[in-house]
């Protein structure tokens, strides 16, 4: 099941009883997994602002399928899309409940990085076929300058970016890697992801106290 939920408030976004703390992952239903991956403390709607400039890296493709019409293979140009069409979920891909929901295999990256996945109708930052190594490196340097994970005035800068392929549980997306060298704690209250992609600003706020899983802050 693949989903990309619309905007909801905290009171209606999460179930009254947080099933992820009440049930074993093996007992989660398909609907519960979809909720955890698309509308939960670890997966939130991004706030997207269109400013019409070109200050961030951009490729000519979209990372995921369009939900209502068209898809990444249709050749739809990002510049042809209405500003209102931009929509994305930011998912904390390295968080334990997300990995358990997706049955993700163990990875040494989990110990080293916070990994966030941007999924939805936004410009891709993936490599293009006609791009050489120098162009790819320059675009990544630009992306590093405009992408960060913030908490209490501190910034964790981008270490790496990769394309996340589509699977049975999620549309394709873009993975952003941030070093765990600056540890996040519940008392930090909030973590904010932000980036610029061509003509749009993307920002997503996570409330850390809501991201407790079986007694631990899971990021």
Label the model's feature ranges.
Residues 14-219:
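PEST-like low-complexity, intrinsically disordered acidic/proline/serine-rich tracts
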Residues 1-14:
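N-terminal export signals
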């Amino acid at each position: 099941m693949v989903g990309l939920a619309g905007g909801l408030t905290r009171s209606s976004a999460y179930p009254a009883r947080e099933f992820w703390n009440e049930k074993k992952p093996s007992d989660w239903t398909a609907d519960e997994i979809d909720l955890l991956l698309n509308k939960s403390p670890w997966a939130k709607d991004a706030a997207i602002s269109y400013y019409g400039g070109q200050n961030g890296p951009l490729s000519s493709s979209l990372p995921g399928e369009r939900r209502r019409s068209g898809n990444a293979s249709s050749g739809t140009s990002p510049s042809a899309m209405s500003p209102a069409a931009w929509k994305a979920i930011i998912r904390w891909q390295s968080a334990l409940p997300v990995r358990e929901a997706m049955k993700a295999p163990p990875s040494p990256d989990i110990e080293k990085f916070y990994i966030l996945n941007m999924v939805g109708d936004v410009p891709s930052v993936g490599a293009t076929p006609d791009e050489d190594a120098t162009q790819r490196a320059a675009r990544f340097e630009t992306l590093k300058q405009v992408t960060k994970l913030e908490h209490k005035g501190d910034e964790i800068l981008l270490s790496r970016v990769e394309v996340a392929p589509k699977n049975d549980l999620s549309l394709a997306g873009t993975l952003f890697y941030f070093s765990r060298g600056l540890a996040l704690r519940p008392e930090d209250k909030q973590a904010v992801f932000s980036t610029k992609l061509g003509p749009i600003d993307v920002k997503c706020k996570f409330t850390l106290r809501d991201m407790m899983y079986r007694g631990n802050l899971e990021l």
